[in-house]
Amino acid sequence: MHESYIRIGKILKTQGNRGAVRVLPLTDYPERFKNMSRVQVSLKGFRTFFTVGEVYHHKNFIIIKFKEIESMAAAEKLKGAFLEVGRDELVPLPEDRFYIFDIIGLKVYDTGGRNLGRVTDVLQTGANDVYVVDTGGKPLLIPALKQVVKSVNLTEGKMVVELPEGLEEL
């Protein structure tokens, strides 16, 4: 899946009375907000850029004061909006690591070349991610482990896996 814009946060509500907003980070790299000078805000199909002023962490949230927003009433209108960045603004990942939105939609093959289906979701379990593959029947749950996932080719849109014995019967 190759989106033009990637969601990195969601504005939940206002924070204080000076027009700051409370953002739920939708990224594994919440520290990125401190280095941003501007961000695209998307709400109900409309997108606009805002200049990032103050940024600080509060519990599990990011508090952002946009320079263009001067009141709590103006900030209230942004409630429910998403903060987005372009693909070129993503944090570079280490080799053999992928963004979830790039994994979803990949065709999955076993090492023998048999088409197992397409990745429809990624479950984040804590220990390791699990790829949900639509097989046309019962979903196949594939652990995202190096010994299982043999290759991922985003250009070709495919993943090759070596399924542990008995996994397909679960």
Swiss-Prot record:
Belongs to the RimM family. InterPro entries: PRC_barrel-like_sf, PRC_RimM, RimM, RimM_N, RimM_N_sf, Transl_B-barrel_sf. It is found in: Cytoplasm. The gene is rimM. Its main location: cytoplasm. This is Ribosome maturation factor RimM. One of its GO terms (biological process) is rRNA processing. Keywords: Chaperone, Cytoplasm, Ribosome biogenesis, rRNA processing. An accessory protein needed during the final step in the assembly of 30S ribosomal subunit, possibly for assembly of the head region. Essential for efficient processing of 16S rRNA. May be needed both before and after RbfA during the maturation of 16S rRNA. It has affinity for free ribosomal 30S subunits but not for 70S ribosomes. It comes from Pelotomaculum thermopropionicum (strain DSM 13744 / JCM 10971 / SI). Binds ribosomal protein uS19. Pfam families: PRC_RimM, RimM. The keyword Glycosyltransferase does not apply. The keyword Chaperone applies. It comes from the Bacteria. Transmembrane segments: none annotated. One of its GO terms (cellular component) is cytoplasm. The lineage of its organism: Bacteria, Bacillati, Bacillota, Clostridia, Eubacteriales.
